[in-house]
């Protein structure tokens, strides 16, 4: 019976994607005992957003990605990665995709968008199930994640940063919720965009593993400031390291310290401040409501997010890292 329903929903999705997504969401609520409905919704949302992104006219950073994509036919894989000289995993993936999709740019964009939303959506479901969230809560979080404007606009503009963000959030979920430190996920995030390195560092702070108190929170912020100072003081030594060299160059560039028009028009700065307030409120609300339980599984990822937000909000002009902020409210929607 359920299989027939899912097949029907899938067919409707092919005819009318939005109606199919609506029916898929309804199936998740009606058939709570089945896990397949929620995974069907994950795929429908990801496929829908992938097709929309493929219709976008490449602008700004995407023009550069398009140029790099078509360069794959001119070089061998090693020369191609060395030519770009940064984020080897992303460019190795791009090289493979060029031949896998017969040099079709639209299919490449669809694949990267699909990959991004699948990782984000799967992370939401893992978090929701581990924390015993209701089916309604998980569905709402998935819908918010798919149709949140600032997230969507960046998936068609700063795709490397978005993929790094997705892998980073999945790393957080595995580390703090599933209790498995999957370094391979962190490496994938770094291989997509090195700007995620400070955020991975934040996730390793000892305060992240402890119950939230004002004292621990302030200690975490202070430690973060100290680490940032050490990072800049050791620039002459660390800038020779492959990954860190690019990160230092970005920190010192005008591109890092300026905002694009799309960021100003979409309210990136103001929304970042608002999200910071919301995340802080969520942390203390959850702590207050769950005093009788071991709330580390839920609170610790939010502590990490809050520290990341403080790091970003102190220097709102850092475009590369503000990109990573906007998926955090998805967890809060649960």
List where the protein language model places each region:
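Extracytoplasmic loop-helix module adjacent to an early transmembrane segment
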Residues: 32-78
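Alpha-helical transmembrane segments and terminal signal-anchor/GPI-anchor hydrophobic tails
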Residues: 58, 63-66, 72-75, 91, ...
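Short hydrophobic/aromatic helix or loop-helix immediately within or flanking a transmembrane segment
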Residues: 63-70, 80-103
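Transmembrane-helix motifs of polytopic, lipid-linked glycan transferases
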Residues: 111-131
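Transmembrane-helix signature of polytopic, membrane-embedded enzymes
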Residues: 124-147
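Multi-pass, polyprenyl lipid-linked donor-dependent membrane glycosyltransferases
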Residues: 153-169
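Membrane-interface transmembrane helices that cradle and orient dolichyl/undecaprenyl
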Residues: 168-181
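Membrane-interface alpha helices of multi-pass inner-membrane proteins
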Residues: 181-204
């Amino acid at each position: 019976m359920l299989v027939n329903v899912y097949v029907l929903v899938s067919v409707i999705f092919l005819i009318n994607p939005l109606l199919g997504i609506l029916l898929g969401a309804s199936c998740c609520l009606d058939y709570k005992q089945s896990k397949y409905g929620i995974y069907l919704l994950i795929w429908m949302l990801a496929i829908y957003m992938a097709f929309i992104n493929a219709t976008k006219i490449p602008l700004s950073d995407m023009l550069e990605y398009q140029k790099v994509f078509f360069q794959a036919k001119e070089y061998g894989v090693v020369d191609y990665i060395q030519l770009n000289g940064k984020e080897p995993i992303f460019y190795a993936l791009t090289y493979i995709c060029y031949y896998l999709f017969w040099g079709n740019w639209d299919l490449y964009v669809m694949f990267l968008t699909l990959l991004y939303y699948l990782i984000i959506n799967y992370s939401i479901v893992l978090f929701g199930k581990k924390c015993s969230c209701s089916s309604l809560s998980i569905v709402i979080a998935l819908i918010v994640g798919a149709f949140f404007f600032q997230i969507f606009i960046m998936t068609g503009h700063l795709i490397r940063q978005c993929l790094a963000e997705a892998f980073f959030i999945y790393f957080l979920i595995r580390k703090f919720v599933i209790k498995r430190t999957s370094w391979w996920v962190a490496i994938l995030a770094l291989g997509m965009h090195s700007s995620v390195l400070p955020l991975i560092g934040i996730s390793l702070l000892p305060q992240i593993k402890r119950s939230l108190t004002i004292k621990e929170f302030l200690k975490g912020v202070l430690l973060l400031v100290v680490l940032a100072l050490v990072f800049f003081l050791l620039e002459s030594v660390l800038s020779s390291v492959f990954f860190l060299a690019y990160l230092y160059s970005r920190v010192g560039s005008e591109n890092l310290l300026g905002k694009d028009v799309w960021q100003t028009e979409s309210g990136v700065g103001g929304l970042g401040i608002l999200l910071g307030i919301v995340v802080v409120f969520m942390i203390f609300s959850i702590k207050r409501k769950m005093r009788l339980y071991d709330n580390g599984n839920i609170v610790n990822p939010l502590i990490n997010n809050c520290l990341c937000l403080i790091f970003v909000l102190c220097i709102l002009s850092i475009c590369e890292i503000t990109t990573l902020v906007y998926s955090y409210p998805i967890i809060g929607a649960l």
